[in-house]
Amino acid sequence: MNTAQSALQPEQLTAAGFAPFGIVVEPFAAPGQPGALPPAGARAINGGTTWRLDLTHNLELDHAGGKPGLAVYSASARQFPMALKVLERHAAGSQSFLPLTGARFVVVVAAPGPAPAAAALRAFITTGQQGVVLNPGTWHHALLAVEAGSFAVLERHPSTAGSGADCEFTALAAAVWLALPGADV
């Protein structure tokens, strides 16, 4: 790595840290488990054996004639450190990444608005039990799997030819190096 280039190390993904960019989706204890408390807004279903927490208020999938699209991505593990060169965003809809196989991933994001500078980037590493819902317009890097795994991806798809694709790309002015915690950069 050229030390004159920017270096970015991910922080642990938390709901508070990720709030400007979207929400964190993570498991919580089921009824009857030791210390189990329902998260705020959850309700009991299935005769009290299950807590349900609806997150649909954070999903934007039908803007401008779009419709929900659910896909499964099978991602290879990335090699770190790695150079980040391009970001993307989906201005008309949210995008969710939910690990199906326990694979950790890094999510690199920047606030909606004009194409971001390197200093505006934030990186978060998941536990493998956490997913994210990106707010519409949030700049982000493509999926960065730490371990190979499968992910459910829920996003807005155009419903007709006229409703348009919803993916804009921007090149970073200079490569930003991403390294995992404890790795040499």
Predicted regions and their residues:
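Non-catalytic, conserved peripheral segments adjacent to functional cores
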Residues: M1-A123, P158-V185
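A short beta-strand-loop micro-motif that forms or neighbors metal/cofactor-
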Residues: T138-A171
